[in-house]
Every structure is written in structure tokens, then in C-alpha cells.
């Protein structure tokens, strides 16, 4: 078994909670991950992809401050659906997710549900 150590970045509505999408309070804008071999505990591959936002197209000022992304950079990102399918293919068949934050898997599942991809996990 391999370990997928994953870190997601996400955006939120720049105009506050009262304007957020009801089923998507946070929209993933980047997936970063490494594969760590289960037996050797070595990094054997890495993955990184910026995602073009579809719901919150303008960066929240705090997210911009933390991630150093610009709206211009995000406008050149890949589609979320394509990125998630590529990412899960990259993960392989026998893996366990490990995350830097307690919300990463929750937000991945929420974003996948929003884009009607929840059945592929």
C-alpha cells in the first residue's frame, strides 16, 4: 500500500458567508500531493495542479494572502472534474490518504459531490 499525502487549497466567496453557494462553501483551487512508498517510506512521485474556479471566480483577499495565487493564475488552471479524475488515476489502486489539515478530505468529497463525482471514490 502507498500513502498519498495530500494538501488542498481552496477559495471562498470574497463577499462573505451571506453570498456563498449553499452546497459549496469552499471551492478547491489546487491539489498538491506526494506518494510515499508503504515499505520504504520514501517519496516516489508528486502531483500538483492549479484548478480554475467556477463558483468563486474572484479570490477572497485572505486566500490570496495565504496562497499567493492571483486571479490571473487561477484563470489558467484546469477544470476540476478533469483534475480529480487525473489525480485519482495518479493515486493508483492501493493507497491511503493522509492530509495536512483535518478538512481536506471533507472538502474534496464536498467538491466532488457538487460536480457530481461522488460515486467514483
Enumerate the language-model features and the residues they cover.
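Substrate-recognition/cap helix-loop segment adjacent to the acidic, metal-dependent catalytic center
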Residues: 103-121
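Conserved non-catalytic scaffold segment of RNase H-like nuclease domains
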Residues: 2-106
Amino acid at each position: 500500500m502507498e500513502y498519498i499525502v495530500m494538501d488542498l487549497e481552496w477559495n471562498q466567496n470574497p463577499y462573505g458567508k451571506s453570498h456563498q453557494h449553499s452546497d459549496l462553501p469552499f471551492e478547491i483551487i489546487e491539489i498538491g500531493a506526494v506518494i510515499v512508498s508503504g515499505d520504504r517510506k520514501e517519496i516516489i512521485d508528486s502531483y500538483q495542479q492549479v484548478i480554475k474556479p467556477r463558483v468563486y471566480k474572484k479570490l477572497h483577499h485572505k486566500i490570496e494572502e495565504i496562497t499567493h495565487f492571483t486571479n490571473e493564475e487561477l484563470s489558467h488552471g484546469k477544470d476540476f472534474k478533469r483534475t480529480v479524475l487525473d489525480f485519482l488515476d495518479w493515486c493508483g489502486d492501493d493507497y491511503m490518504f493522509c492530509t495536512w489539515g483535518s478538512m481536506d478530505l471533507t472538502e474534496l468529497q464536498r467538491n466532488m459531490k457538487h460536480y457530481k463525482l461522488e460515486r467514483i471514490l
